[in-house]
Amino acid sequence: FRVGGFAGRVIERMGGVPQNIPGGEIYQALEKGTIDAAEWIGPYDDQKLGFNKVAPVYHYPGWWEGGPQLDFFINDKAFNALSAENKVIVECAAAFAHTEMQAMYDARNPTALKQLVGAKTKVLPFPQDVLDLAFKESMALYEEISTKNPNWKKVYDDYAAFRRDQNLWFRFTEMRFDQFMQSKKL
């Protein structure tokens, strides 16, 4: 399974064998059977690269990445050396790039998904037991790292508290609205 980072560590805990293969080599690895599956970006990019021609089953949701998060990294010393005006310019440019990229994928992924289905790609949900095991092993990994790395623990504890609050809020807003809209024929 081509996946890297934390997701690869979770796959390993689940009994899989993660492979860290560069994006440009995924198609060939799937075609040759070097790997059985690959995590990449989403329908738009997956279809553009033709992955469905060599891996005709498309599983969702991507439990390793509930949604995209585009990051911008800058050296702290370099950023702090900027004028107040230039700091705002960098912050605004980063925010704009994130919003623009998110909007682009939100616009292109539905069409690409339809085209994948039209090309006879089987789009299937991960079985619930797989999602549950991935969640369990993810949480165990985060706790394991927390016991070994105080910096991680500090950041993770803050993140986990924020996530709990967000999950509560989303149950009343986003999730209920999404469920409602998905139940309607548009």
Functional labels for PLM-detected ranges:
Residues 1-186:
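N-terminal secretory/targeting leader peptides
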